[in-house]
Amino acid sequence: MFFDGLWSYRSYADLMLANFFARPEQNLRLWDNATTNPQRKLVAIAGNDAHANIGVSLNDASGKQLIGIKLDPYERSFRVVRTHVLTPSGSDLSRESLLQAISQGHCYVSYDIFADATGFDFSVRHSDVIMGDEIALDQQPELVVNTPLPTRIVIIKNGNFFGQQQGTTAQFTPDGAGTYRVEAYLDTLPPPAKGQPWIISNPIYVK
């Protein structure tokens, strides 16, 4: 795996890091189970374990570096995965408003090393309900997804595949109460990034 990454570094320096991670199957399964049985709110966030210590160097006998390639500089590592937090439009950004938005699940995780996911939205049409919120089934909610790039939009209900659409927008109608969340995939990316999630949303809870 390391040599695959080294080989692809020159042409695809950012995508090279995709050799070292995969869809977090076990974590997502545990999260889905925790938010479904019984239905309860549990917010997903993500961050980077950045050390800038992956690379190749050639030193002389005195230990002086002759050639060095840093594969994971901090400016690249900190773009691998991000938590995008949604705060009310026009409100002042503060520590308190940031923590409140995160605690409410008004956020989503994205692998921005693939593409900047700013502008993603998962909400209920004709309402103020966004990811992290709940809504009653008898209100006949329509779930709406918007992405900044054309993508494969997958909706997951209670941890199971519910449906998918292609494009920058998608609409899904819940078939019952449950925990609904979104995963988005950039299928046009080459391996090893192909098949890896680009965006993982927090759920909307339909009661």
Per-range role (PLM):
Residues 5-9, 22-39, 43:
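Histidine/acidic residue-rich metal-binding segments in metalloenzymes
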Residues 36-207:
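C-terminal functional module detector
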